[in-house]
């Protein structure tokens, strides 16, 4: 269920927005206080509707605090500020949309529905490139480069490195690597992963790439992580 935070110092606006969005199936948290809104900021919030003109803490302040906390929450401003420079400033802060009062609650619902649909499409697009300092992995062409210089790798070596790197800092078992990269059971050839990881390490070390490494976590598997 999508969690929406509505912040507006006008209680009637908060109430009507809450009614419309709950009818659409949203989980809705509301507040009429910008100060309280800051205390509600968290990764649990999927999207926000913010007024701008509020006493003490305004809608701009909330977004600046969100960025200070390194939270990435999409937000739409709902405001009576109608001048072009207001809209431009809001968009400069990163607003995903800008709705001027008086407004249609149904239109606001549709705007947020459309925004979330676009976000889902974006997040479901396959990642085609990974970068870790000087190291770059390009999935489409199965190419690995260090400082722009191509590192020759066999297909399975690339696929193994890609799988580990795309799950950075996660310990991945040998059986999972065999299943996902080679497509067969662990017991068929337990040494396959060891051999390929040894080759990958050698090739990266030959290019003097040492800022990231594939660490052996004894008894558990392997982890791609920044070197300690």
Curated annotation (Swiss-Prot):
SMART domains: REC, Trans_reg_C. GO terms for molecular function: phosphorelay response regulator activity; transcription cis-regulatory region binding. The modification 4-aspartylphosphate is found at residue 51. One of its GO terms (cellular component) is cytosol. Phosphorylated by SaeS. PROSITE patterns: OMPR_PHOB, RESPONSE_REGULATORY. Residues 3-116 form the Response regulatory domain. It comes from the Bacteria. One of its GO terms (biological process) is regulation of DNA-templated transcription. Coiled coil: none annotated. It is found in: Cytoplasm. Residues 127-226 bind DNA. This is Response regulator SaeR. It comes from Staphylococcus aureus (strain NCTC 8325 / PS 47). The lineage of its organism: Bacteria, Bacillati, Bacillota, Bacilli, Bacillales.
